[in-house]
């Protein structure tokens, strides 16, 4: 179960140095935080020279604290004309500051005007204080800060990246011994790239021994300020110390990808790849984007809450928060999707659930800006209509028009996107280092080293996968005219959903009809939608007094789902190679599986495409580029398209 996140408490020494009462230690040297960061961590890792002329450089830090090391590294990157194309800075933090305390801490320590401006950008982007991985982008996506909130002892083993430099900057070993244990250094060794370097202000004997045991060489150099010595070194193991090598970029001759399908999954992939400079050819069987399930007039977005903070809750939390940041970035760049005001209300299934979830929110200490428990009276005031029970409010949840989001993402891709409509992909074939896509007539359409299958129900068939089965779920939604009933002030979900559109129409839905191919609107489905919503919002039954079901309009679309209700996101397995080696792979883990170089998928999003799509696209782009993953590895493995193949291999049923 996830541990509650406990924010840092900011205090100051008499000399004005930021100080942690919890660890009885200072956040940086009294001589100066900026100078310490430059001397210890940049010069200690031979930066900026080591990142020059490189496409990608990754720093991993233990202990983000005030963010001084990140700010100084960012400033050095900005000042270097030979800087790397993309700088990833990944940092763990068990006790992050609130935004207000972060501002106070940096204001006390940052006198340099240029770095103060960067500190302001950091504060403006500061994430909600909830456990997990938070990816923030600066410099138009060329500087990426990935914050991992939680105990580093637990979170470091969940990261997947190739580090070029380590900043070992927790509180001193005698004040915070848990961050300097052999287990922590073993986790770092698992992520170290070739010739990765490290620097740390300490020269403790225990730290030296732990570094050596993990495969690092060290040397003692002059310390900063009043410290006599510090350690620098590199990863140079004398023998193999890990089962899997950290990730590398996909070896391609050209940065060109084909994206099949232009719904939420495909358009998000287009945006994330073109943001990295990839050229993308999109193939769509319809005449425009977002014509299948992504074509609904609006969709709600919110995380899933559970009493044990399940895998599903953790993934939807990450996806929800990442999507909000990405949509804001699109708007900042002038590509504005249509979305409603912030706020979404979820009504509990019964009073027992309402009480249980209120207790859960308190025990996890979820911040009120993320989710807040509400009584029935609170809910009625928020919704501006009668409700059956209390529940919980997502202040930043809401609704968005999926088609407008898809259009905005394609606009953001600019000239790097070539769009082809009315093309139905039928199969792919490998020729040397390229994948060729063929249409239904057997004609070759386009080739590229990378293909992303974002075509829902057709993905497994076109990709030739046998262990990625999905099912179709018919969903009919109902549009209630403005004169049919009073609309709630904001989206309300629970037993179905009621969503107030901008024109006074209320969108309700949606049915869940497994393996039902009927595309026609059905009166019975309209009745089902209204009755279900009326269990949350009793006044919705008034719609029957104004309009007969046969007079109502709506839309039918088909969700694509898996048996575990999680999407398929990531690299495809080479199923034939895996089955040939089934005996060796009976105890395999996801990283053991052979992969089909260049084939990736983003499909089976069910009813949560708005939450899954942006994060899934970022995960795939990171896998392709060899960048740090934007979520914990166990969460990515829960989404792995090869998970059902892996299950069959473990059970001895793969053939």
UniProtKB/Swiss-Prot annotation:
Annotated Pfam families: DAO, Methyltransf_30
Gene Ontology annotations of biological process type: methylation; tRNA wobble uridine modification
Cofactor: FAD
Keyword terms, alphabetized: Cytoplasm, FAD, Flavoprotein, Methyltransferase, Multifunctional enzyme, Oxidoreductase, S-adenosyl-L-methionine, Transferase, tRNA processing
Major localization class: cytoplasm
Keyword Cytoplasm attributed: yes
GO MF term list: flavin adenine dinucleotide binding; oxidoreductase activity, acting on the CH-NH group of donors; tRNA (5-methylaminomethyl-2-thiouridylate)(34)-methyltransferase activity
Gene3D superfamilies on file: D-Amino Acid Oxidase, subunit A, domain 2 (3.30.9.10), FAD/NAD(P)-binding domain (3.50.50.60), Vaccinia Virus protein VP39 (3.40.50.150)
Domain of life: Bacteria
S-adenosyl-L-methionine is among the record's keywords: yes
Stretches the record annotates as FAD-dependent cmnm(5)s(2)U34 oxidoreductase: 260-655
One GO cellular component term noted in the UniProt record for this chain: cytoplasm
EC code(s) of this entry: 2.1.1.61, 1.5.-.-
Catalysed reactions, as listed in the record: 5-aminomethyl-2-thiouridine(34) in tRNA + S-adenosyl-L-methionine = 5-methylaminomethyl-2-thiouridine(34) in tRNA + S-adenosyl-L-homocysteine + H(+)
Region called tRNA (mnm(5)s(2)U34)-methyltransferase, residue ranges: 1-236
Subcellular location: Cytoplasm
InterPro entries from the UniProt entry: FAD-dep_OxRdtase, FAD/NAD-bd_sf, MnmC-like_methylTransf, SAM-dependent_MTases_sf, tRNA_MAMT_biosynth_bifunc_MnmC, tRNA_MNMC2, tRNA_S-uridine_synth_MnmC_C
Homology family: In the N-terminal section; belongs to the methyltransferase superfamily. tRNA (mnm(5)s(2)U34)-methyltransferase family.
Stored PANTHER family: SARCOSINE DEHYDROGENASE-RELATED, TRNA 5-METHYLAMINOMETHYL-2-THIOURIDINE BIOSYNTHESIS BIFUNCTIONAL PROTEIN MNMC
Name of protein: tRNA 5-methylaminomethyl-2-thiouridine biosynthesis bifunctional protein MnmC
Protein's organism: Paraburkholderia phymatum (strain DSM 17167 / CIP 108236 / LMG 21445 / STM815)
